[in-house]
From Swiss-Prot:
HAMAP family: DNA_ligase_A
Binding site for NAD(+): D31, A32, E33, Y34, D35, S80, L81, E110, R133, E167, K283, K307
Source organism: Listeria welshimeri serovar 6b (strain ATCC 35897 / DSM 20650 / CCUG 15529 / CIP 8149 / NCTC 11857 / SLCC 5334 / V8)
One Gene Ontology term of the molecular function aspect: DNA ligase (NAD+) activity
Pfam families xref list: BRCT, DNA_ligase_aden, DNA_ligase_OB, DNA_ligase_ZBD, HHH_2, HHH_5
Record-listed E.C. numbers: 6.5.1.2
Catalytic activity: NAD(+) + (deoxyribonucleotide)n-3'-hydroxyl + 5'-phospho-(deoxyribonucleotide)m = (deoxyribonucleotide)n+m + AMP + beta-nicotinamide D-nucleotide
Taxonomic lineage from the root: Bacteria, Bacillati, Bacillota, Bacilli, Bacillales
Ligase listed as a keyword: yes
Protein function: DNA ligase that catalyzes the formation of phosphodiester linkages between 5'-phosphoryl and 3'-hydroxyl groups in double-stranded DNA using NAD as a coenzyme and as the energy source for the reaction. It is essential for DNA replication and repair of damaged DNA.
Residues forming the catalytic site: K112 (n6-amp-lysine intermediate)
BP GO terms, sorted: DNA repair; DNA replication
UniProt-recorded name of the protein: DNA ligase
Coiled coil: none
């Protein structure tokens, strides 16, 4: 018969084993001994469920199924960091620091872990709550999922009541193993460890979170001053004495030269780490100096994140494929030997056009250097010509469309070759994908794969056919069950009520982007009015130039377009502008009337396009750069140089929450 004393002893023993293994990377027992003691603990808990506490090691394995994630307000905001992209940015940061607090300074430099920012609350030394960063003010409660991370102690070495901040992440090995399993099971692969970590921590089934082998590094306390330390470096040391996992690769630097040396070292060595990093974080070490520097609305003035330049990696160019876009443009795509770049495996990359391939002398069979532009889109930079064997083949663009066989043409003043056959299947398919996309008709459940399936099965030949799809036909398709078909048809039905600009953009009229579609919809109000417009009328509208006007007139002169619009009308698709008209709005409603607004950083609740549409609906004009002519900057998380420039120019800065206050009452934008 087990007694409670033995139960408590087992908890302490297992906690120590976990600390040795997961925090200080110095295992003191074999796995078999750990497992044996865990089994003993589980048997006691089965016999005495009333003894089980939230900090029991058994809670690490998950098992709790959550109903959802509640909101958590951060007592102290979790601010994001301004970014530096080069030494000039760092020198500007250093100058601002010295101008304010003098030259007696030091920087604590830390690796910027590429994961998910989280907050952990301890009460009297016991783990109480864990939350995501969210928008910095309000996050989500992920207490149960964070409990499954073995390197997070359930009890601190001292009975402190503190809130610590850190970065939860998925180690490279765990990521690779997870994607191998998902591939075997036919599931979609995660793009990178950061996405995998974020997805894992938002699982409602804590067993899934526990199986993902996440880890964490802690790097701050909500208020280090509460711990009786005077510097950030002392604070990190204190976290370690409490049993929390802090990254060992930090370094105290006394000047910028030492900072540069640290950055150079880890730029070279980052690939050797067991986890992904995407930069280096500098923090003014003295806490009193931090207080003097203060913070902006979004970020501390005493810290900055240096972002690594895009990683460049060599690999083999196996082939060049040609893709036909919705406007007939032929785009060459590099087929590559799979290689890991900036946290993801890349097997395809953009080659842009034939002229660029010729200019760079890129040949099939070459070893090429690739990078991710902005760490997002892979592209081929150049061929490594010194590695050629002589077997490489120069690339020649074909004279005919790879899909329909029509002769390709190069229009005046254009670099790209085009297929101008309006019945080209590839163009129709791409046009359908564009029509249902988020910025166009925004039909949930109609992704690229479903569109291709519908097109291949001859269920749709143009966009109007989407609105006449039947439940019976959809249920015959592979992987289309009752629930998904019902949801899809409901989404198609709902899209019929979209405002005119969504439909106009979705139709894919050449040269007409989302902004021009909005201008046309506001001006003409109905599709019938727009159809009758001549070039002179069109060019009198802001955003509509001669080339676009010609394209619009040509489009509506086409009899096939008339037939398509009649079919859309028959389906009940709205062809009227239903959004706000500026002349009908009061001065109070037109908060951005005549103003230039810049969006920067990552938005948490609005998409970039929704934010842009909201600003325009309030009378504003959205610009891509900050200048003296900018009236307002809306800053999300990780806002970089644009935010810094706005502060220097004393331009008013809005948060995302400030902008959301002006959303329509129904909470959405047409």
């Amino acid at each position: 018969m087990a007694d409670k004393k033995r139960y408590e002893e087992l908890i302490n023993i297992l906690d120590q084993y976990s600390y040795d293994y997961y925090v200080i990377d110095n295992p003191t027992v074999e796995d078999a001994e750990y497992d044996q003691k865990m089994q003993e603990l589980l048997k006691i808990e089965e016999a005495h469920p009333e003894w089980v506490t939230p900090d029991s090691p058994s809670k690490r394995v998950g098992g709790e199924v959550l109903e959802g994630f509640t909101k958590v307000a951060h007592d102290t905001p979790m601010l994001s960091l301004a970014n530096a992209f080069n030494r000039d940015d760092l020198a500007d940061f250093d100058r601002r620091i010295r101008d304010k607090v003098g030259d007696d300074i030091a920087y604590m430099c830390e690796l910027k872990i590429d994961g998910l920012a989280v907050s952990l609350q301890y009460e009297n030394g016991k783990y109480k709550q864990g939350a995501t960063r969210g928008d910095g003010t309000v996050g989500e409660d992920i207490t149960a999922n964070l409990r499954t991370i073995r390197s997070i102690p359930m009890k601190l070495q001292k009975d402190f009541s503190i809130e610590v901040r850190g970065e939860a992440f998925m180690p490279k090995r765990s990521f690779q193993k997870l994607n191998e399993i998902r591939e075997e099971e036919g599931q979609m692969l995660f793009a990178n460890p950061r996405n995998a970590a974020a997805g894992s921590l938002r699982q409602l089934d804590t067993k899934i979170a526990a199986s993902r082998n996440l880890d964490i590094f802690l790097y701050a306390v909500a208020d280090f001053g509460e711990m009786g330390v005077t510097t950030h470096s002392e604070g990190l040391d204190m976290l370690e004495t409490l049993g929390l996992k802090v990254n060992k690769e930090r370094r105290l630097c006394n000047n910028l030269e030492e900072v540069y040396a640290y950055i150079d070292e880890w730029t070279e060595k980052r690939a050797e780490l067991a986890y992904d990093i995407d930069g280096i974080v500098l923090k003014l070490n003295d806490l009193e100096q931090q207080r003097q520097m203060g913070t902006t609305v979004k970020s501390p003035r005493w810290s900055i994140a240096y972002k690594f330049p895009a990683e460049e990696v060599p690999t083999k160019l196996l082939d060049i494929e040609l893709n036909v876009g919705r406007t007939g443009v032929i785009t060459p795509t590099a087929v590559l030997e799979p290689v890991r770049v900036a946290g993801t495996t890349v097997s395809r990359a953009s080659l842009h056009n034939e002229d660029l391939i010729t200019e760079k002398d890129i040949r099939i069979g070459d070893t090429v250097l690739i990078k991710k532009a902005g760490d997002i889109i892979p592209e081929v930079i150049k061929s490594i010509t010194e590695e050629r064997s002589g077997s490489e083949e120069p690339f020649h663009m074909p004279k005919n469309c790879p899909t329909c066989g029509s002769e390709l043409v190069r229009l005046e003043e254009e670099v790209a070759l085009r297929c101008i056959n309006p019945k080209c299947p590839a163009q129709i398919k791409e046009g359908l994908i564009h029509f249902v996309s988020r910025n166009a008709m925004n039909i949930d459940g109609l992704g690229e794969k479903v569109i291709i399936q519908l097109f291949s099965e001859h269920l749709i030949k143009d966009v109007a056919d989407l609105f006449f799809l039947s439940k019976e036909k959809l249920l015959e398709l592979e992987r289309m069950g009752e629930k998904s078909v019902t949801n899809l048809l409901a989404s198609i039905e709902a899209s019929k009520q979209n405002s005119l600009e969504k439909l106009l953009f979705g139709l894919g009229i050449r040269h007409v982007g989302a902004k021009a579609a909005k201008s046309l919809a506001v001006h003409f109000e109905t599709m019938d009015n727009l159809k009758m417009a001549d070039k002179e009328t069109l060019t009198s509208i802001n955003d509509i130039g001669e080339k676009m006007a010609d394209s619009i007139v040509t489009y509506f002169a086409n009899e096939e377009v008339h037939d398509l619009l009649e079919e859309l009308k028959r389906a009940g698709v709205n062809m009227t502008y239903t959004g706000p008209k500026l002349e009908d709005m009061s001065e109070e409603e037109l908060v951005f009337a005549g103003k230039t607004v810049v969006l920067t950083g990552k938005l948490e609740k609005l998409t970039r396009n929704d934010a842009k549409a909201l600003i325009e609906s309030l009378g504003g004009n959205v610009s891509g750069s900050v200048s003296k002519k900018t009236d307002v900057v809306v800053a999300g998380s990780d806002a970089g140089s644009k935010l810094a420039k706005a502060e220097e120019l004393a331009i008013p800065i809005w948060s995302e929450e400030d902008l959301i206050e002006y959303l329509p009452d129904e909470g959405g934008l047409n």
